[in-house]
Regions:
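Radical SAM enzyme [4Fe-4S]-AdoMet core and its adjacent flexible, acidic
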Residues: 42-45, 61-238, 245-246
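Conserved alpha-helical substructure of the radical SAM core
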Residues: 1-70, 81, 85, 93
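Cysteine-cluster motifs in flexible loop/terminal segments that predominantly coordinate metals
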Residues: 249-259
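Short, intrinsically disordered/low-complexity patches at protein termini
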Residues: 52-53, 231-233, 241-243, 254
């Protein structure tokens, strides 16, 4: 909590949004509702993304009472079989219960929170897309967002790839292998993430964006320098310059980015 308060004090005058998630599950942190409440008191828009496996009735009430603006609940299948195809060992019923708890708490406290159901487009759930479009509000969400899936093993295909390539981040080449789609030339549409925000890990490392999952491009640590110093550091500016000047030789972390 001390580190969070240290970060909040540095960003509250200039930041607009604070996202409470990266690689782990944010609801496992019992101090999360308190952290959100502090960010809201500082005037920040707050977002949490969760798989809802730890979204108990008590946690739902605490999140709503914290003033949370938006919660993303990821459910990638609507039978236990299709759900487990991507979220191995997860329980669909727990996720659906979590959505229901959020809806009930939202009504009880008359909260304007956006409850966003996020569904990855996968071959294992494509037969359910039409159903969820019709029923997402009935199961507790206020909004529905479909998202293409990031796959690490895609060069030779992947059983999770949707049948229709339109709904995939990857396209099949003439030789049968797959590449990531290029939505626009990088020199015409440069990355915006490196200029608009950053990721701060639980141990204080400052990363350029959420795609640096292996911490390969860390700017430094917020426990030894201010966030402003790190964000405008030589390391940060060198990375930005490289991405602008060498759009065809991007860092490995950029290969799976969909922006």
């Amino acid at each position: 909590m001390e580190m969070f308060q240290h970060i909040l004090e540095q960003v509250k005058a200039t930041a607009h949004t604070m996202q409470f998630y990266f690689q782990g599950e944010p609801l496992l942190n019992p101090q999360l509702p308190q952290m959100i409440a502090l960010a809201r008191q500082a005037g920040l828009y707050t977002i949490v993304s969760t798989n809802a496996q730890a979204l108990s009735q008590e946690m739902a009430h605490l999140l709503i009472q914290s003033g949370l603006n938006r919660i993303i609940v990821s459910i990638d299948g609507f039978s236990q079989e299709s759900y487990e195809a991507y979220r191995t060992g997860g329980s669909l019923q727990k996720a659906l219960d979590g959505l229901r708890f959020l809806r009930e708490a939202k009504r009880q406290y008359h909260s304007p929170i956006r409850i966003e159901l996020q569904v990855l487009r996968l071959r294992t759930n494509e037969h359910e897309w039409h159903w969820i479009r019709r029923h997402y509000k009935a199961i507790g969400a206020t909004h529905l967002v479909f998202k293409t899936a990031q796959l690490y093993d895609y060069e030779h295909g992947n059983p999770l790839m949707p049948t229709n390539e339109r709904y995939s981040r990857y396209k099949r080449k003439a030789d049968g292998t797959y590449v990531h789609k290029q939505h626009a030339p990088h020199h015409l549409s440069p990355c915006y993430r490196l200029w608009s925000g950053c990721v701060i890990t639980t141990n204080g490392e400052v990363l350029p964006c959420c795609y640096d999952k292996e911490h390969l491009h860390t700017y430094g640590n917020i426990t030894t320098q201010t966030l402003s110093q790190l964000f405008h550091s030589d390391k940060a500016n060198t990375l930005r310059r490289h991405i602008l000047l060498h759009p065809h030789h991007l860092p490995e972390m950029c290969n799976n980015c969909n922006h």
